[in-house]
């Protein structure tokens, strides 16, 4: 199982996390650049591992288990670091909490449904949410370096990142509600059978 390329990419994404955390605390340009690069690599492998698994016919139970865990670890680490550093602050923290809460709830829901052999397929809207979330976090990780490079009048990398974070938080609420509704419908139908 570990020899399968998609699984190696997924495990690599988990291994990146401690290096990402260390890079986040490196000062200045190189710290910003390294943390940004590691997060972008992790985000890209999230897209790549699933695509390769389907293309190569290498979908596996291990990949199915580890992929969502790897996603949540890197996103949670990034959001927590961005809040702790003050990059995400004040009311913006609500967006981060919405994203983290949804991830925990949906993980629990998927586990519950898996017991009944029910899978929740990922919707296109959820894929868009993930893309916006990763893009927002990537921009926020660029720090002052990103603000100097990406600056359109009143909109710099941080401002655009916060706007995209809120947009992904709203999509998070919507897609989370959709998944929760499907899960509740399934639970009710199972109760009625018994």
Regions of interest found by a model, annotated:
Residues 104-112:
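Membrane-water interface of transmembrane alpha-helices
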Residues 12-17, 70-79, 106-107, 129-141:
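Core segments of transmembrane alpha-helices
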Residues 16-65, 78-98, 156-171:
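Membrane-embedded alpha-helical segments that form the functional core of polytopic membrane enzymes
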Residues 2-3, 11-15, 64-67:
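Hydrophobic alpha-helical transmembrane segments of integral membrane proteins
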Residues 15, 44-52, 69, 73, ...:
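Active-site His/Glu-centered metal-binding helix of metallohydrolases
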Residues 14, 37-40, 69, 97-100, ...:
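Residue-level signature of the transmembrane alpha-helical core
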Residues 1-7, 17, 27, 35-43, ...:
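C-terminal membrane-associated helical module and adjoining short loops/tails
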Residues 10, 60, 123:
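Residue-level signal for threonine
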């Amino acid at each position: 199982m570990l020899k399968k390329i998609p699984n190696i990419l997924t495990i690599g994404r988990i291994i990146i996390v401690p290096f990402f955390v260390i890079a986040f605390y490196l000062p200045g340009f190189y710290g910003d650049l390294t943390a940004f690069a590691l997060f972008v690599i992790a985000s890209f492998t999230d897209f790549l591992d699933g695509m390769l698994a389907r293309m190569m016919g290498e979908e596996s139970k291990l990949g199915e288990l580890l992929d969502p865990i790897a996603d949540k670890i890197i996103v949670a680490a990034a959001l927590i670091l961005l809040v702790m550093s003050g990059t995400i602050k004040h009311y913006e923290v609500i967006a981060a909490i919405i994203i983290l809460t949804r991830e925990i709830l949906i993980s629990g829901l998927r586990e519950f449904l898996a017991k009944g052999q029910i899978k929740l397929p990922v919707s296109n809207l959820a894929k868009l949410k993930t893309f916006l979330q990763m893009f927002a976090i990537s921009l926020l990780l660029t720090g002052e370096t990103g603000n100097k490079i990406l600056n359109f009048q009143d909109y710099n990398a941080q401002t655009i990142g916060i706007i995209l974070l809120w947009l992904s938080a709203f999509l998070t609420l919507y897609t989370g509600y959709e998944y929760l509704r499907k899960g509740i419908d399934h639970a009710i139908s199972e109760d009625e059978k018994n």
